[in-house]
């Protein structure tokens, strides 16, 4: 396991912060408060309004539309159909990613996280396009597709923000989790597959608990923000199978170790300890765990 974000303090609807990177956007410090730091009380008072989350409804609507198109295309068994829908999904994913950028900026500003990463939407848009393309090709017309698409679109932004700031808004984690669970429940009903739904929830809860225990033992590695995000990401993998869940535990940590080694050897910068955002590795590792053959790591 590798070091990652460490949540130094969480208030309701506050920001998940790094122990080594507490600096937030400049605020007016009170007596005894260091400049640039936001108190837990201040973060706790900043609660997003329901209107802040409206763009997520758009993400869900587009995800469902892509699923309907995929269900129709894969049902016709025409070779060109799935590829056309996957290409459409990629374009839709990129558009959705750009469309939710203002919401991401609002959530970051609300809890005093630097909003600068949200001004760079190209990489999240390209990453979301790739994930949506792959999700359509893998899931086809299965009803789990909207859940995967929605979780992917929102998680990519969480990873992007975490990469630059070593934190991301707790309201964003809650939005990803709630959206994923609701759409997952829809998939259980539509596909009449309670076994996959139960496996997804159990897998998410088990890995969440494992990460939490490890974070407590190591005093914050991985960070509690990553622990929270791991639940819905592992649940997404759990829908596929237990061997994929094992990959979802292994891959993020392997990728993170590789990332740290590359940074130390070729990065040309000195870091204090190991300071990096773990969410990007969680997202990439989750996608690979779904896409790769089950049990590939046993070969």
Feature-to-residue mapping (PLM):
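A membrane-topology feature that recognizes alpha-helical transmembrane segments
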Residues: 1-299
